[in-house]
Amino acid sequence: MVLRFPKFSQSLAQDPTTRRIWFGIATAHDFESHNEITEERLYQNIFASHFGQLAIIFLWTSGNLFHVAWEGNFESWVQDPLHVRPIAHAIWDPHFGQPAVETFTRGGAVDPVNIAYSGVYQWWYTIGLRTKEDLYTGALFLFLISAISLIAGWLHLQPKWKPNIAWFKNAESRLNHHLAGLFGVSSLAWTGHLVHVAIPASRGEYVRWNNLLDQLPHPQGLGPLFTGQWNLYAQNPDSSSHCFGTSQGAGTAILTFLGGFHPETQSLWLTDIAHHHLAITLLFFVAGHMYRTNFGIGHSLKNLLDAHIPPGGRLGRGHQGLYDTLNNSLHFQLGLALASLGVFTSLVAQHMYSLPSYAFIAQDFTTQAALYAHHQYIAGFIMTGAFAHGAIFFIRDYNPEQNKDNVLARILDHKQAIISHLSWVSLFLGFHTLGLYIHNDVMLAFGTPEKQILIEPIFAQWIQSAHGKTSYGFDVLLSSTNGPAVNAGQHLWLPEWLKAVNDTSNSLFLTIGPGDFLVHHAIALGLHTTTLILVKGALDARGSTLMPDKKEFGYSFPCDGPGRGGTCDISAWDAFYLAVFWMLNTIGWVTFYWHWKHLTLWQDNVSQFNESSTYLMGWLRDYLWLNSSQLINGYNPFGMNSLSVWAWMFLFGHLVWATGFMFLISWRGYWQELIETLVWAHERTPLANLIHWRDKPVALSIVQARFVGLAHFSVGYIFTYAAFLIASTSGKFG
């Protein structure tokens, strides 16, 4: 018998319906459920696939470099970063005739092109790249790394090169390798690149392999390092009149602690960034030598965790049993990794605009907006994935005997208190925030705006003041004129920091008022409700009062039949599915807030946000409607403009989003009846009935159809907002 797809599941391969195809795709990456899988093969397959993932990433970044070098305008952009528009790549087949060709021929190009809103130009410029040849060299290097990664992936699937299970479960060696070997060494390498290539380039010196050993990054070379006079590396930094990319106003320091921003580029000082990476290097080198491996020195993680028993007895057996639970569960490890990465990605979004590290990126408003929204959406998907794998851990990997009375078991014991508290917080935030907004709307509608309830965020303002913002008049900590912290930091980073914090033209510590207070609590509502759904899904994954035997049904099940009412929509997968809608809504509010606040800042019109953000109609009218008006009129009978493609994407995104509801509202029976009618028509239509199918067409399962609906909702939602964000920002600022 010829083996049919999927080869990993014999029962599915013999399924006579189209379920074979769709369910085969759905479970292709659920290695644990495949026939003939062993724990060792599972680890080996995942390990090898990591190299494939790296190959894809390196090929993608190589492609970015190659296309900008080939079709971009990097060299002319370098000459005038604030006025030349960076080109991402050419448009080979501009549709819609001559008007389209003229519209999209920009950035000094002779043919239609796309403008780059990714920030790669600013990144490459900051790290010392200056010519097309630099970009081609980088593209070739990354292409080779991609090929090597592919070979490494293939190699680690060969019998001789497959690591054994003990190698994968050696937690201490893995920690040391990742901390010191990956994070530590790569941070040191990056410090080296900044010191030897990027900082000299910012001072007008072009350093490459052919002159690397001739051009000393610091006049005194390695002398201060070996004589212990490290402070010499911080002396004579770039002056405030430094012209980036030239020797005008340049200093000689390579590792500084200046604080604040370079006046011309509005980005962090490169010498501060190099210092930061060197400090991280040292931290990770220390961390990478803390765990016991070959020489019997350092911590044993198992002993460390087993010793964590709080003496008061209020946490039972503390962390006992956690080592084996964690080390033997890939889902637990993945859940922790995703939770960490999700938080980190959101922090990246927050820091990229408030403390920009790339030269001139702060003045490229569309790029700033695009990068913020991009990283926040990615963070949302990663965070929901963390809870999904946490739930799968509880269903597939959790052993109650192994974890008796430890912190994990006690979380399960207290789940009803945890879930009900999250519910209470969500209800409180929702009713009060919506109540305030609606009250304010009614007051505006009745022509009495002075009767709005406007609450100043005094605690947040106090925190900003403690960090040095003086406009609120709190006179506390760093905003105090004569405190110990102020006096201690006067000769270090403080003067530049205080200048940056109190500069109204950047995004560091924006001035906040009643509108910010309200939207902050709306976002808090979204975050807490998303968390409630995710936490409930994970903690109830093994069973609940309603369905104590839930774990026997697995991660995703639609219902337990008609004889057991109330068991629909309560699988852990359903919780993940519901949470994604809340996650998308929450990040919608986050990005609306960020974007509107910044649009008014960039247009020097902050009073619009301050006055209109305190009621819902203000958001709908002065943010959404006002900024989408160009999109709604993006193409018309009189021709087209550079926003037309975004206008089309805005429309198309809405259509994809709306298609999602078709799958979310109509269930399996409707589609099965429709399919059977189409089959009847097919069999009776001449010519068409010459084609026969091997798999009997059947409707998707309830869970699969929900996933299709969710995918359309998510993709359409993001497409719609991406088009709105880029068009409304670039339409105003170019």
UniProtKB/Swiss-Prot annotation:
GO terms for cellular component: chloroplast thylakoid membrane; photosystem I. The chain crosses the membrane at residues 46-69, 135-158, 175-199, 273-291, 330-353, 369-395, 417-439, 517-535, 575-596, 643-665, 707-727. [4Fe-4S] cluster binds at C559, C568. Chlorophyll a B1 binds at H654. P700 is a chlorophyll a/chlorophyll a' dimer, A0 is one or more chlorophyll a, A1 is one or both phylloquinones and FX is a shared 4Fe-4S iron-sulfur center. PsaA and PsaB bind P700, the primary electron donor of photosystem I (PSI), as well as the electron acceptors A0, A1 and FX. PSI is a plastocyanin-ferredoxin oxidoreductase, converting photonic excitation into a charge separation, which transfers an electron from the donor P700 chlorophyll pair to the spectroscopically characterized acceptors A0, A1, FX, FA and FB in turn. Oxidized P700 is reduced on the lumenal side of the thylakoid membrane by plastocyanin. This is Photosystem I P700 chlorophyll a apoprotein A2.
